[in-house]
Amino acid sequence: GVSIGQRISDLIEITKDNIRVNKDGYLMIDIVQKKTGSEVSPVIADKEIIDQVYPDLPYKISEQKFNKYMKMVCKEALIDKIVKGYKMNNKTKRKELVNLPKYEMLSSHDLRRSFATNYFDKVPTSILMNLTGHNKESTFLEYIGKSQDKDYYADAFIKAIQS
């Protein structure tokens, strides 16, 4: 998720057949996103990750079980700062604003959002949108919590020509 920016529903469907080496020698994963039908091919930047998971592909796990394990790992990693967030109250079936350790609030979707947020200032928005399957820039920017101020394009242009 955090390395390739895909939804958990797409990650759990990856098989060895999805992985290939491109013309420049980089490992790629060819994915047709379930939600949008978009075809994306993110790069696997960290070969160690693929070395660890490749032998076990396809690795079937439910989204719920993945999220449970993710919370356990984050707890072990001491990602426990108290944060405000909305959590479903199982009795009332409504979301409530609560203060909880951060690991309790995290889910697989945070990995995807972190991918987009972490690369936002390093990779052109159009490339990130392609990899995450977003069609509208306004939706993408809202997704990662960035507002598009009136100088956004001018600043991006200046940054690009100064590089």
Q: What are the language-model segments listed below?
A:
Residues 18-25, 121-143:
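Short, polar N-cap/turn motifs at the start of nucleic acid-interacting alpha helices
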Residues 56, 71-130:
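Short, basic (Lys/Arg/His-rich) helix/loop patches that form interaction surfaces
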Residues 13-52:
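Conserved tyrosine-mediated DNA breakage-rejoining catalytic core shared by Y-recombinases
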Residues 32-39, 55-62, 102-107:
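Short, contiguous acidic/charged loop-to-helix segments that flank catalytic cores in large enzymes
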Residues 40-43, 48-50, 130, 142-163:
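DNA/chromatin major-groove-contacting recognition/catalytic segments
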Residues 9-14, 128:
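Alpha-helix N-cap/helix-start motif at helix boundaries, enriched for small hydrophobics
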Residues 1-9, 117-118:
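Short pre-functional
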